[in-house]
Amino acid sequence: MSMFNKVVKEFQWGQHKVRLETGEVARQASGAVIVDVEDTVVLATVVGAKSAKPGQDFFPLTVDYLEKTYSAGKIPGGFFRREGRPSEHETLTSRLIDRPLRPLFPEGFYNEVQVVIHVLSVNPEIPADIPALIGASAALAVSGLPFNGPVGAARVAYIDNAYVLNPTRDQLKASSLDLVVAGTERAVLMVESEADQLSEEVMLGAVVFGHEQMQIAIDAIHELVRDGGKPEWDWQPAPKNEALIARVTELAQNDLLAAYQLRDKQARSAKLKEVYAATSAKLEEDALAAGTVAADKATVGNVLFDIEAKIVRSQILNGEPRIDGRDTRTVRPIEIRTGVLPRTHGSALFTRGETQALVVATLGTKGDEQIIDALEGEYRERFMLHYNMPPFATGETGRVGSPKRREIGHGRLAKRALVKCLPSADEFGYSIRVVSEITESNGSSSMASVCGGCLALMDAGVPMKAHVAGIAMGLILEGNKFAVLTDILGDEDHLGDMDFKVAGTEQGVTALQMDIKIQGITKEIMQVALAQAKEGRLHILGKMTSAVSGANTQLSEFAPRMITVKINPEKIRDVIGKGGSVIRALTEETGTTIDISDDGVVTIASTSSEGMAEAKKRIEQITAEIEVGQVYEGTVLKLLDFGAIVNLLPGKDGLLHISEIVNERVKDINDYLKEGQQVKVKVIQTDEKGRVRLSAKALLNEAAAAAQSDTPPQQ
């Protein structure tokens, strides 16, 4: 009899066979599930603390997605030959898994929960993110933790006007859409996508298609729980302190109402801090007078937050102005300035209300491309977008250093929004880096990065296919009443039920990200949100087009210029030289950057046109073929008894025999030639071994004959 209580569920999911198993591996975790999708295998584990830490006032969920190089049959690079800090892809996938799971834990559950997913085996054609999300959901479901799942997930492509479920990597290359959707049986919770200017109808159809198809995975998880799940935790939320809620409401409600009449963010924040402090102080006085212990500040803060949420939500649903005085459809005032930094290649300052992004574009060569060593193989990225939000952007102090998960995620969203509108490498051979520095933030800084990024690229002279703008939408839903909010503020994001970011052009959507905090968002509500987002996006695009009609026709004087030279691929080694000696000397002496592709295309880049011309000339000389009948101005390298060695081109010498110097007999070659002397010679013979014979007297004879016939000699 086996020592394992192993449970396996298999199902066909689109073009792939999926296997879920639990009960054999990682049995000491609260829950553990292995997911196998056509040889891409992940182990998802969950551990939940049995009790919350004293004073805990938030839900401490961590999700770590870890790729092991052995899964692809590789040994890690680096001195230690082991996996190090998470890659950008691992960080983004961790966020992708976290986002649909977090809303499904019950309110008031503050026990620490850690979800860890290890990628154990990789089929290069099957991305591991969907198996990882399914595995994390299944591990939570079998663990017995209080979790309102399970969650399903699916990737959707759009190929030849048809949706494709969980496409392979090859299929994705031919797709105009890469969309990941996650949700429960009843509702969509998360969407992440990149698209090639698709309509809102196609995008919504993909979300609905993915939600329908994920039900197969959800059913399989239910079966796994039925046969291999652990007993459900006996957890109940702490009873609400109705007396405290009533007293806090009595003390603070009117002051909170007054605070939310202030339209300026900083004034409003200052007033809210006063209300919080005054309420806590009054409660401490009450406790002292009654001889009891006052409620801790975290508990009081949660009650105050709930009152704030009710105030803001009810005002919006009743048709009253929003926090900053706008109606539900108005975009905040926009100011645009380009060329703001004198020596950068392209720059823009994009301000929308109290959100501001200073965005800079830099052009580089092929050598500046990012080399990514992924499990499925090494590849290069010619477009990079990095997002930074320092603490001063929100008027706070804090840590400054390497990017946090949020910054990496916002940068990737902005990159997704812009990448489909960039020119191809054939049309514009530069590598491109965009950096968005958020200098002010009050909602939707990632979408400000999209707008500013597009403007900075155009300022740098990048011929974008179209202007790209982004907008963040919000939602308030109570029963049958709902309101979709255009261009949400930070407070509206915290107090609302949905964060919905849409970026695109006049033609269609290029990126869509959706995070829904509640269940019950219908297709109709998403339809309204998408239509309202399009209205807002077109408004912003109008402002951007008025400010910058198109890309600059001239690159910055500080940007590198590029020219290309086509050489025989067999000559590449001559240009590179032994140990790179030739190309190294070329780049150092001409001040250029030189990249050579396998097909013989040489790209020369420099800010100096003279340096580029010199590098091009020398490369052409190195790769030139010596032809019989050609005349060269050569340099005497060495004198021999029977002639001279003459250098014609870099690395190419020929023999000028003593009998070919002049017509008369030469007794001493030193009477006619010296080492270092420039001499004009004609190629009279080459052989299969590459040996070259030269003649100077042939040119003398031609000159004499030409003089007699008045025909100019060969030059």
Swiss-Prot record:
Q: Which UniProt keywords apply?
A: Cytoplasm, Magnesium, Metal-binding, Nucleotidyltransferase, RNA-binding, Transferase
Pfam families, sorted: KH_1, PNPase, RNase_PH, RNase_PH_C, S1
Any keyword Nucleotidyltransferase?
yes
Where does it reside? Answer: Cytoplasm
Record's catalysed reaction(s): RNA(n+1) + phosphate = RNA(n) + a ribonucleoside 5'-diphosphate
Where does the record place the KH domain? Answer: 560-619
* UniProt: Mg(2+) binding residues: 493, 499
Per the UniProt entry, the Enzyme Commission number(s) are 2.7.7.8
Q: Which biological process terms from the Gene Ontology are attached to this UniProt entry?
A: mRNA catabolic process; RNA processing
**Class of enzymatic activity (EC top level):** transferase
InterPro entries, A to Z:
ExoRNase_PH_dom1, ExoRNase_PH_dom2, ExoRNase_PH_dom2_sf, KH_dom, KH_dom_type_1, KH_dom_type_1_sf, NA-bd_OB-fold, PNPase
Which cofactors are named for this entry?
A: Mg(2+)
GO molecular function (one) = 3'-5'-RNA exonuclease activity
What residue stretches are annotated with the S1 motif domain?
A: 629-697
Q: Which GO terms describe its cellular component?
A: cytosol
Family membership noted in the UniProt record: Belongs to the polyribonucleotide nucleotidyltransferase family.
According to its UniProt entry, the function of this protein is described as: Involved in mRNA degradation. Catalyzes the phosphorolysis of single-stranded polyribonucleotides processively in the 3'- to 5'-direction.
This chain belongs to which protein, by name? Answer: Polyribonucleotide nucleotidyltransferase
